[in-house]
């Protein structure tokens, strides 16, 4: 197994909490956060230069499915709140990578950390023997470079 590399590339995006994100108690229903975090991972790749459709076409992959996730909910959010999701890759291995999400809420003193979450994702293409299955593939070097913060020259 290859040693994880330490990327530096980060993306931040603001998300408005909508009425449909909330439960009867008026706070965000936790599965909605996971949908927001999944979108944040896709926006990280967009910030690196690829929309998901471009990645699929250019590298002949199905996507980068999540194989593990965890979250620590520190401060709730409610309808109308604007949260900031900060996303970065924290480690890259041969065919998988780790994502860290930090969700912030505005406060009088700046921002407060509301959620800490992690994901493990696999770079996956169609299985050569069964198109209904996926097979992990090595991450292309250009993807690794961009996720580590390098730009193509």
What are the functions of these language-model segments?
Residues 2-66, 125-153:
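Hot-dog-fold acyl-thioester-processing enzymes
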């Amino acid at each position: 197994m290859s040693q994880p590399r330490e990327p530096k590339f980060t993306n931040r995006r603001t998300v408005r909490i909508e009425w449909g994100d909330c439960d009867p108690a008026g706070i965000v229903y936790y599965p909605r956060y996971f949908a927001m975090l999944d979108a944040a991972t896709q926006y990280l790749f967009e910030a690196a230069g690829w929309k998901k459709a471009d990645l699929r076409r250019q590298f002949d992959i199905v996507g980068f499915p999540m194989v593990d996730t965890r979250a620590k909910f520190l401060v709730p959010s409610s309808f109308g709140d604007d949260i900031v999701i900060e996303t970065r890759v924290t480690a890259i291995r041969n065919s998988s990578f780790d994502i860290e999400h930090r969700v912030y809420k505005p406060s009088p003193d700046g921002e407060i950390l509301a959620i800490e979450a992690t994901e493990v994702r696999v770079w996956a293409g169609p299985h050569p023997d069964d198109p209904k299955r996926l097979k992990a593939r090595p991450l292309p070097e250009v993807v690794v470079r961009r996720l580590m913060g390098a730009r193509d020259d």
